[in-house]
From Swiss-Prot:
GO cellular component annotations of the record: adherens junction; apical junction complex; bicellular tight junction
Annotated spans, Disordered: 154-212
Compartments, record wording: Cell junction, Tight junction; Cell junction, Adherens junction
Organism: Danio rerio
UniProt-listed Pfam families: CCDC85 (PF10226)
Keyword field: Cell junction, Coiled coil, Developmental protein, Tight junction
Keyword Transmembrane helix: no
Superkingdom to which the source organism belongs: Eukaryota
UniProt record similarity statement: Belongs to the CCDC85 family.
Listed name of the protein: Coiled-coil domain-containing protein 85C-A
Coiled coil ranges: 23-87, 121-146
């Protein structure tokens, strides 16, 4: 029976009932008790070791947790700093983007303004170039006109007065006395003293409106005479302007002729010498050049048939050629310049203007002499009227 209890204790004492334990002896129970205590102590030691190991591991884990917390805290701080830095950089990026957009708008605006300014300046440059070209052309034309006028003035000044003297001496049959042209004086014969100007000495003075119209017509006639000498190298605008002036001159000449016919005689010009003395010469040039052109074309026919002088040595004014009538006017102007001018006329003509009128009269006589050399009818009129022009 004791063997059975021993076998049971070996397996498990907890499974042994109390009755069986009561049946065991004391020595067996003590032995089992000590054995159980020893096992218990071993278990407690193992448990303590295990607890120490667990505590040690727990401490290690705690240290790891603490270190991880510290690392996590540092990482959080770094993350916060990075966030702040990202926010700052994002603000800078937004500011830079906004600034870049503003600069782009400003650049587009400045570029458009610059393009507009460049276009305006290019247009102005083109206008300036065109104006420069027109000014250069006008300067060239003016240079040509000035050179032509200088050549004409030099040619007119270099002409010898002996040519006109010889031509007029031949016309008058050598009976006229020779006088110098340079003194600016002129002699009138008895024929001029008995000219139609003296037959109409009691004619009323024209009205102020007629004087103004004649003065304007004479100004245009003088302008026309200067424009006739302009060379053909000018542009179309200048030639059109010249043609318009010539048309205006022809209209004014017709009006002037009608006004002169209404006055009744050539002697009316004597009453206008105060206002028109400076314009007679250039009007004679224009009228005489037209008469010379018609003489060259052979289209002039003297009215009245015969050219024989009348008892007094003159033909009626309607039967005289236009050149002879104008020559009488020029001679009258030349004679009036040599006379003593009244006090109310002293301010009208200066010495320079008198010299210009004398020079124009000389030119008219020279042209008249050239025309008379080609047409015998003019020579007969000049010799019949016994004109003595400046020599």
């Amino acid at each position: 029976m004791a063997k059975n209890i021993t076998d049971v204790s070996r397996d498990d004492l907890s499974k042994v009932s109390d009755e069986e334990l009561q049946k065991c002896s004391k020595e067996e129970l003590l032995r089992r008790l000590r054995k159980v205590d020893a096992e218990k102590m071993n278990l407690m030691l193992e448990h303590g070791n295990m607890m120490k190991d667990v505590n040690r591991r727990l401490q290690l884990h705690l240290h790891e947790i603490r270190s991880l917390k510290e690392v996590n805290q540092k990482l959080q701080e770094d993350n916060q700093e990075l966030r702040e830095l990202c926010c700052f950089l994002d603000d800078d990026r937004q500011k830079g983007k906004k600034l870049s957009r503003e600069w782009q708008r400003f650049g587009r605006y400045t570029a458009s303004v610059m393009w507009k300014e460049v276009g305006v300046f290019q247009q102005k440059l083109k206008e300036l170039e065109s104006n420069q070209d027109s000014v250069m052309r006008e300067n060239l034309e003016l240079k040509e006109i000035i050179i032509m006028l200088d050549d004409e003035r030099n040619g007119a000044g270099s002409r010898s007065s002996i040519d006109s003297q010889s031509s007029l001496s031949n016309l008058n049959g050598g009976s006229a006395t020779v006088r110098d042209v340079g003194d600016g004086s002129s002699t009138s014969s008895t024929g001029s003293a008995g000219s139609p100007d003296h037959h109409h000495s009691h004619i009323h003075k024209p009205t102020e409106g007629k004087i103004t119209s004649i003065r304007r017509s004479m100004d245009d006639l003088s302008t026309n005479h200067l424009l006739r000498n302009i060379p053909n190298g000018l542009n179309d605008s200048s030639s059109n302007y010249i043609r318009q002036l010539e048309t205006k001159v022809r209209i004014l000449e017709d009006d002037n002729k009608q006004l002169l016919s209404q006055q009744g005689s050539v002697g009316d010009l004597k009453t206008l010498r105060k206002g028109l003395s400076l314009y007679h010469s250039e009007s004679q040039l224009s009228s005489l050049s037209q008469f010379q052109d018609t003489l060259q074309n052979g289209s002039i026919r003297i009215a009245g048939g015969d050219l024989a002088p009348t008892v007094t040595g003159y033909l009626p004014a309607a039967q005289k050629p236009e050149a002879v009538v104008h020559a009488m006017k020029v001679l009258e102007v030349h004679e009036n310049l040599d006379r003593k001018i009244p006090e109310d006329y002293e301010e009208d003509l200066s010495e320079k203007e008198k010299a210009i009128v004398r020079e124009m009269c000389n030119v008219v006589w020279r042209k008249l002499g050239d025309a008379a050399g080609t047409k015998p009818s003019i020579r007969q009129h000049l010799s019949g009227n016994q004109f003595k022009g400046p020599l």
